[in-house]
């Protein structure tokens, strides 16, 4: 399935039905009083979060969403039926914004969470409502109230406990494949991962947690370089970031400069993301060149007081120690504090 995490919608609630102008007409009562019924209210437009969806793909081709209008009132004091509410289902983690102003209208973070975003218009009153002692036969009724309209921007931010980040081809997909049932595409070239991938990690006696493999980040990502800032937002909800660093290319490559560049990108994207706790995983420890530079790399990160764990997703070396560190940090604070 194609991963879609942003979509624009044109939304409207239902108009209210019009009130009816009608008079009682029966045999021997040619000039009966008014009996026009009220119009029904228009349907509300409601958003509901559901775990059954993982992408906004279904809405990409349904960009106009409108609730049903209320039925018009009728004679014999019959009221129009209310318009049916329209429930738009979205994945858990969907942020709803006003397209024009960018104002956040809703943040749906729980399964089953609902919000009435646009209220349906009220139904108009029929002429029976307007009869008075001085006007016993009103020949007018109220029109239905118009529904609300709004252009919305929906953004999906993945609800992951752990966000994996690093340069393209740093070993993120290999790690999530090793520790979960997720099976992202893996190959020896940059940008193998073109969409976020989620994996559930069940580990020892800890509660299971969700890990997200985010497409590789390069310098300028906050401005859209590489796969762009559209994926940085998925790290914002993570409780902890695991930054994977490949030192097997030393001395030709400079993983330390890359590490600092990626962290600058996080800080430029959002201050909160730049300050989020990180654990470093030194990947590809099954390669001799990575082993050669291990002591140097550990010293570099330890000087900066950054927890560092050498791992190999190929052999499993060090993976258990990394998962221990992740789990201990995750359950040290409740999720609402992340």
Curated annotation (Swiss-Prot):
Residue ranges occupied by any OBG-type G domain in the UniProt entry: 160-331
Binding locations of GTP: 166-173, 191-195, 213-216, 283-286, 312-314
Any coiled-coil regions, as ranges: none
| Cofactor(s) annotated in UniProt | Mg(2+)
Q: Which UniProt keywords apply?
A: Cytoplasm, GTP-binding, Hydrolase, Magnesium, Metal-binding, Nucleotide-binding
> Which Gene3D superfamilies does this one have?
GTP1/OBG domain (2.70.210.12), P-loop containing nucleotide triphosphate hydrolases (3.40.50.300)
Give binding positions for Mg(2+): 173, 193
State a single Pfam family of this protein: GTP1_OBG
Q: Does the keyword Metal-binding apply?
A: yes
Annotated Gene Ontology cellular component terms: cytoplasm
Q: Which GO terms describe its biological process?
A: ribosome biogenesis
| Complex and partners | Monomer.
Q: What is this protein called?
A: GTPase Obg
Q: Which gene encodes it?
A: obg
